[in-house]
C-alpha cells in the first residue's frame, strides 16, 4: 500500500455526497457527516451568508 499521489486515484469510488435530510439538496458529505449547503450535522441553524445573495441597488444614488 503506497501513500501520496497513487492513493488519490482511490478517492473516486463511492459517493461523496448524498441527499440531505433537512434541505433536500444532494450535498450531504458522507465522510464529514454534514451538509455543505445548509450546515445540517454541523449546526442547528441554517447555513446562510450575506454574500450568497446579490446586493440590491436601492440605496445607491444614480448619477
From Swiss-Prot:
The keyword Zinc applies. Its cofactor is Zn(2+). Keywords: Metal-binding, Ribonucleoprotein, Ribosomal protein, RNA-binding, rRNA-binding, Zinc, Zinc-finger. GO terms for biological process: translation. One of its GO terms (cellular component) is cytosolic large ribosomal subunit. A zinc finger (C4-type) spans 20-38. It comes from the Archaea. Signal peptide: none annotated. Binds to the 23S rRNA. NCBIfam families: PRK04179.1. This is Large ribosomal subunit protein eL37. It comes from Ignicoccus hospitalis (strain KIN4/I / DSM 18386 / JCM 14125).
Amino acid at each position: 500500500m503506497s501513500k501520496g499521489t497513487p492513493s488519490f486515484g482511490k478517492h473516486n469510488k463511492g459517493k461523496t455526497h448524498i441527499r440531505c435530510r433537512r434541505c433536500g439538496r444532494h450535498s450531504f458529505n458522507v465522510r464529514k457527516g454534514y451538509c455543505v449547503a445548509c450546515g445540517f450535522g454541523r449546526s442547528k441553524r441554517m447555513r446562510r451568508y450575506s454574500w450568497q445573495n446579490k446586493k440590491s441597488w436601492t440605496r445607491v444614488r444614480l448619477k
